[in-house]
């Protein structure tokens, strides 16, 4: 399924750029209508188990939309655009399907087929079912008991899974080595800079700064001498250095939390950083020529 989704995404990238440019809402619509529908095919049968490859496809798509670097962690990408893991939707579909099948007692063939699926191996059957219910804080017995009482559980289980994956994501952000600042700029809803119409390229620039792409100090996998400022060649290229210490930039009067805030108050300063880097690269290129 991941291969099919990647193929569709590859086709979408080309004409999506031509038709919609950087329009965030239209690209979200493309994902929902074309790519996600492919990834969710047959989820009623495999939705108990989280599919890491499919989650990776979704994160890759949103990195592309926001112009983020490939090393941006998936949990930061999902938090920035406020999208759930695909497992939430897949689990809901499986639970709803199970409830519909078990509610059709007159269809014996369908009932027997479903019993065999639940008893299957490889995470699609009983083990996957148990893991799913455990993840959302229920036992299989508790869910089955409530269903016998006529209570539909899919909405409650979907809500619980959404809360669980949100807690998991926030926990990963707290422990992040790549972007430890991000925890302090998390928003409860979609960041306001993404909600404003127009300036799509500006949104991508802000997203890169917020998600840690425009610093080198946080690239812990690089050598120390590779993490220096690209403008002045001095200290490690952190946001604090760029704001207060870099000789090639004017000292900014606001703090980094305001610069990275959801309203993008530091947008003009970000443009200055990007433009100054581009001018420096052009000078260095001319010098080499």
Positions of PLM-derived features:
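N-terminal regions of proteins, emphasizing targeting and processing segments when present
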Residues: 16, 61, 87, 177, ...
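Intrinsic low-complexity/disordered segments
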Residues: 8, 55, 82, 162-164, ...
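Family-specific functional microsites
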Residues: 19, 184-289
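Non-catalytic, peripheral interaction segments enriched in hydrophobic/basic residues
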Residues: 1-120, 128
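Flexible, low-complexity interdomain linkers flanking nucleic-acid-processing modules
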Residues: 93-204, 260, 273-276
């Amino acid at each position: 399924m991941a291969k099919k989704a990647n193929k569709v995404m590859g086709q979408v990238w080309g004409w999506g750029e031509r038709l919609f440019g950087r329009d965030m809402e239209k690209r979200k619509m493309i994902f929902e209508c074309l790519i996600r529908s492919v990834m969710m095919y047959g989820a009623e049968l495999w939705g108990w188990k989280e599919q890491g490859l499919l989650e990776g496809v979704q994160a890759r798509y949103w990195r592309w939309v926001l112009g983020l670097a490939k090393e941006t962690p998936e949990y930061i990408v999902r938090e920035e655009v406020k999208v759930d893991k695909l497992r939430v939707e897949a689990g809901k579909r499986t639970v709803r399907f199970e409830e519909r099948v078990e509610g059709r007692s007159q269809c014996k063939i369908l009932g027997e087929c479903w019993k065999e699926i639940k008893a299957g191996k490889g995470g699609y059957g009983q083990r996957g079912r148990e893991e799913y219910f455990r993840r959302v804080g229920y036992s299989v017995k508790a869910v089955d008991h409530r269903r016998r009482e006529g209570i539909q559980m899919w909405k409650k289980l979907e809500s619980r899974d959404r809360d669980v994956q949100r807690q998991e994501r926030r926990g990963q952000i707290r422990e992040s080595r790549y972007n430890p600042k991000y925890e302090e700029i998390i928003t409860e809803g979609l960041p306001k800079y993404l909600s404003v119409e127009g300036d799509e390229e500006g949104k991508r620039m802000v997203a890169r700064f917020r998600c840690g792409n425009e610093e080198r100090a946080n690239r812990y996998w690089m050598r120390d001498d590779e993490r220096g400022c690209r403008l002045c060649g001095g200290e490690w290229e952190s946001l604090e250095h760029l704001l207060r210490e870099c000789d090639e930039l004017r000292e900014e009067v606001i703090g980094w939390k305001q610069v990275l805030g959801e309203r993008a108050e530091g947008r003009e300063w970000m443009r200055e950083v990007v433009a100054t880097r581009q001018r420096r690269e052009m000078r260095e290129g001319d010098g080499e020529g």
